[in-house]
Amino acid sequence: MRISKPHLRSVSIQCYLCLLLNSHFLTEAGIHVFILGCFSAGLPKTEANWVNVISDLKKIEDLIQSMHIDATLYTESDVHPSCKVTAMKCFLLELQVISHESGDTDIHDTVENLIILANNILSSNGNITESGCKECEELEEKNIKEFLQSFVHIVQMFINTS
């Protein structure tokens, strides 16, 4: 079973390590290990998180196969690399439409997890300002299948540049 919040995996591993090495914290070397462990818990692990985002997108795609959701979503199909953050924010907003339209708890939970992962990655990159990009409402409306394919494409753009 996959942990639904993979960004917490490294923290839990480091907590176990802390308990294991607890008796050694009385030495100077033990204190250094503890401090370095605390710092490493906060370091971004963007490549792994983007892979988890793609995994969640595939899960959403599988879950909606059995449903009939007749929604059109604003979709950026030809993302310029200088507008990928703006496009990603639009995709994340439209994901909430899928969650609402489906009414399915599995889809809702997967969408929430995906949004948390993506927002954590985007926030770890700092505040990037992009100009000359289309607003979400200016994008072409497409069906859910095309939306998810375009979403995977933009996530792969983030993976390839990290």
Curated annotation (Swiss-Prot):
Residues 30-48 form a propeptide. It is found in: Secreted. GO terms for biological process: immune response; interleukin-15-mediated signaling pathway; neutrophil activation; positive regulation of cytokine production; positive regulation of immune response; positive regulation of peptidyl-tyrosine phosphorylation; positive regulation of phagocytosis; positive regulation of T cell proliferation. The keyword Hydrolase does not apply. It holds the Pfam family IL15. Glycans are attached at residue 127. Its main location: secreted. It comes from the Eukaryota. GO terms for molecular function: cytokine activity; cytokine receptor binding. Keywords: Cytokine, Disulfide bond, Glycoprotein, Secreted, Signal. The keyword Acetylation does not apply. SUPFAM superfamilies: 4-helical cytokines. Disulfide bonds join 83-133, 90-136. One of its GO terms (cellular component) is extracellular space. InterPro entries: 4_helix_cytokine-like_core, IL-15, IL-15/IL-21_fam, IL-15_mml. Residues 1-29 form the signal peptide. Cytokine that plays a major role in the development of inflammatory and protective immune responses to microbial invaders and parasites by modulating immune cells of both the innate and adaptive immune systems. Stimulates the proliferation of natural killer cells, T-cells and B-cells and promotes the secretion of several cytokines. In monocytes, induces the production of IL8 and monocyte chemotactic protein 1/CCL2, two chemokines that attract neutrophils and monocytes respectively to sites of infection. Belongs to the IL-15/IL-21 family. This is Interleukin-15.
